[in-house]
């Protein structure tokens, strides 16, 4: 056999390897092929190809492994079990940029499934190999490395700490300054995954100077980038007053309010979440949001999310806006009044009534309670907005969750304690359970002694008669309030409306002796 014919065998073997690995990589894109390849032992066949002397075969083998591992946690565990990760990590520092992208994809695909798999990636030494990739000239290699780092960090605080200790954050801050939009997105996402866990991790991201570079990107034309930027700023701001102030001092207001009107649903939602995380900390931060026009912007956002709910099928989109309004209103009567003036009651009531998910109804009930609990004027705004009746309905409905019932009861109790709008109180008297009637009657007992017109209206609307009927079946505080209200009327009026009055009259007929001529 001549030398030429021998080489032909080698060439045929190489072509066969290329054909095989490319076919496997292509087949791995279709879910219906995964189980067949797994049963055929694809992992064991691909593993030696990672060390092939032909770079294109190495890259295709890594790509195929990444697609398989990305499909399910079982296949990702198979990658770990076949000891493929150490080979990838070793090659990551040796090979060309194409292989580095493919290898980083495999690490990301394994790490994404669970904390245990992400820990396996860390234990393989992947972070030490990924960090230099963040300094590569090729932006696509940086993207692949940043993406894998974010997927490792997202699971737990310990994993995020490992990522931080590897020195990734300063390099991610440099990456976000690069011109490539995709690299900016992935870097912002990775920093968000790091800082979401603890105040200390968020502080490390802040100390690296990230906020100064994130803040201007709020106005970037790319929607996917704005999603990640708003998310990252919210993850920083949520931990403490100091971190929220760092975000505010980076001049995110009023620009972030414009994101509440963005055409992209996730930009709007993430912006609302960021505002919520800032608003919840102190009255001063809530006031800053209101002074920037935030109350009206949030109210419009909630109303708009309600209108778009049918289109997107995403009721959760309005949740951060509802909660942000509640946090703002909770701090002071002035801030609550700003919400009322911004016409915030109606969209919150609409969410309470129309939203199918109980946790959003519960958030709406809580926010309405924060608005109405301050003064009689605040409570009147909710009473005139027909809120009380709907809170009561949520409280007593058989299908309401425990959380919704609790929040509706607390909100109703807080509003009733300040409510002096008797026309709104009276319908609740008949329809409420005893535990709510108690709060309603307490208000009547406090208000009727000082208002002649209210006393007359209470009689004309049947309230006094209902009280006499109620008096026969209750005791305790309820009985005390009924007696206090009865004391506002002449005894003969009270007697006239008592259930036994007709019997008393009939008894008098029996006792009466007519004058016989």
Model-assigned labels for residue ranges:
Residues 1-36, 41, 45-48, 494, ...:
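N-terminal "cap/leader" segments of large eukaryotic alpha-helical scaffolds
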Residues 3-9, 45-47, 87-89, 129-131, ...:
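Buried hydrophobic core positions in alpha-solenoid tandem helical repeats
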Residues 8, 33-40, 57, 74-82, ...:
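Short, hydrophobic/charged alpha-helical patches characteristic of ARM/HEAT alpha-solenoid repeats
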Residues 12-13, 53-54, 95-96, 137-138, ...:
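Short inter-helical turns and helix N-cap capping residues of alpha-solenoid HEAT/ARM repeat scaffolds
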Residues 18-31, 45-48, 59-71, 90, ...:
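Alpha-helical solenoid repeat architecture
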Residues 41, 50, 83, 92, ...:
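Residues that form ligand- and interface-recognition hot spots within folded domains
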Residues 65, 76, 85, 107, ...:
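Intrinsic low-complexity tandem-repeat regions in disordered proteins
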Residues 374, 378-517:
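Alpha-solenoid helical-repeat scaffold
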């Amino acid at each position: 056999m001549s030398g030429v014919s021998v080489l032909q065998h080698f060439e045929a073997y190489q072509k066969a390897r290329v054909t095989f690995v490319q076919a496997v990589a292509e087949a791995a894109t279709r879910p219906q092929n995964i189980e067949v390849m797994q049963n055929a032992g694809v992992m064991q066949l691909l593993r030696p190809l990672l060390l092939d002397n032909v770079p294109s075969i190495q890259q295709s083998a890594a790509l195929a492994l990444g697609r398989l591992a990305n499909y399910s946690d079982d296949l990702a565990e198979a990658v770990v079990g076949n000891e493929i990760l150490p080979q990838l990590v070793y090659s990551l520092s040796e090979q060309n940029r194409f292989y580095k992208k493919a290898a980083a994809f495999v690490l990301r695909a394994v790490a994404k499934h669970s904390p245990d798999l992400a820990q396996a990636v860390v234990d393989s030494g992947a972070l030490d190999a990924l960090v230099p990739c963040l300094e590569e000239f090729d932006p696509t290699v940086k993207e692949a490395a940043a993406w894998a780092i974010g997927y490792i960090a997202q699971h737990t605080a310990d994993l995020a700490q490992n990522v931080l200790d590897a020195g990734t954050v300063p390099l991610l801050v440099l990456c976000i300054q690069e011109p490539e939009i995709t690299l900016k997105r992935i870097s912002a996402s990775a920093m968000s995954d790091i800082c979401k866990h603890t105040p200390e991790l968020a502080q490390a991201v802040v100390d690296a100077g990230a906020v100064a570079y994130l803040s201007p990107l709020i106005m970037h034309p790319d929607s996917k980038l704005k999603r990640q930027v708003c998310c990252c700023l919210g993850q920083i701001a949520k931990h403490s007053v100091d971190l929220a102030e760092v975000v505010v001092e980076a001049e995110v207001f009023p620009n972030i309010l414009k994101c509440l009107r963005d055409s992209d649903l996730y930009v709007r939602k993430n912006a609302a979440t960021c505002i919520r995380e800032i608003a919840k900390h102190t009255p001063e931060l809530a006031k800053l949001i209101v002074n920037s026009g935030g109350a009206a912007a949030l109210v419009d956002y909630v109303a708009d999310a309600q209108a778009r709910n049918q289109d997107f099928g995403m009721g959760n989109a309005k949740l951060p806006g509802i909660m942000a309004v509640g946090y703002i209103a909770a701090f002071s009567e002035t801030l609550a009044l700003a919400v009322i003036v911004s016409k915030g009651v109606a969209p919150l009531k609409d969410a309470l009534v129309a939203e199918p998910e109980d946790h959003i109804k519960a958030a709406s009930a809580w926010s309405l309670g924060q608005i109405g609990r301050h003064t009689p004027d605040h409570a009147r705004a909710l009473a005139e907005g027909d809120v009380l009746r709907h809170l009561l309905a949520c409280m007593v409905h058989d299908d309401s969750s425990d959380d919704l019932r609790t929040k509706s009861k607390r909100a109703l109790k807080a509003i009733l304690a300040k409510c002096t709008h008797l026309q709104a109180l009276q319908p609740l008297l008949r329809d409420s359970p005893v535990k709510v009637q108690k709060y309603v009657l307490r208000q009547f007992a406090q208000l009727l002694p000082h208002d002649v017109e209210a006393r007359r209206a209470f009689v004309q609307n049947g309230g006094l008669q209902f009280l006499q009927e109620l008096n026969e079946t209750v005791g305790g505080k309820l009985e005390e309030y009924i007696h206090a209200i009865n004391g506002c009327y002449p005894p003969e009026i009270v007697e006239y409306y008592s259930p036994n009055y007709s019997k008393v009259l009939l008894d008098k007929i029996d006792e009466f002796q007519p004058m016989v001529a």
